[in-house]
Regions:
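Contiguous, structured surface segment used for ligand recognition
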Residues: 18-159
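Sec-dependent N-terminal signal peptides
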Residues: 3-13
Length: 159
């Protein structure tokens, strides 16, 4: 089986805008986030207390990445220690996202009070034992879903 490398490269254009690039060649960058690489498989984490649709979309994302790369990501109902993690959830109910915001590692203020909006951002060393996290924070359950689906779409999955 041929192993593909899938890389999501986040380049922050400004405080409110970002550009996401999906690439099969892993390049080292401050904003690069390897989902699947030769020795790396990210864990997709959601909060068990978040809306049920967040769990469902996390499961679909894991399936989408497996369809594209042939590699299955791990899925967890809380953030886990590991080299790379994807944390998906709503700003209201995801404890990890709220903690990152309160520690000043992500700015969720543009999402507060908004409908169907999301933020995608990489964070280096967000928690002890985690090297890098890709945060997909939604203003509400639809926002979290749209954010993760947009990553699937960028990886080549048709909605």
């Amino acid at each position: 089986m041929r192993i593909f490398s899938l890389l999501i490269l986040l380049v922050v254009a400004s405080a409110l805008q970002s550009q996401v690039v999906v690439n099969e060649n892993v390049k080292h960058s401050k904003y690069a986030f390897p989902l699947v690489a030769s020795k790396i498989k990210a864990t997709v984490c959601y909060d068990a207390n978040d809306y049920p649709v967040v769990k469902k979309v996390a499961e679909l994302f894991v399936s989408d990445i497996e369809n594209v790369t042939g590699q299955k990501l791990k899925l967890a109902d809380e953030w886990k220690k590991g080299r790379t993690v994807v944390i998906v959830g709503t700003i209201e109910k995801n404890q990890a996202i709220r903690q990152l915001a309160s520690n000043g590692k992500i700015d969720i203020s543009p999402l507060e009070g908004a409908w169907e909006r999301y933020l995608i951002q990489t964070v280096n060393h967000p928690f002890p034992g985690v090297d890098k996290a890709l945060i997909v924070a939604g203003s509400d359950r639809r926002g979290a879903s749209y954010g993760l689906f947009s990553l699937s779409e960028m990886a080549g999955v048709s909605p």
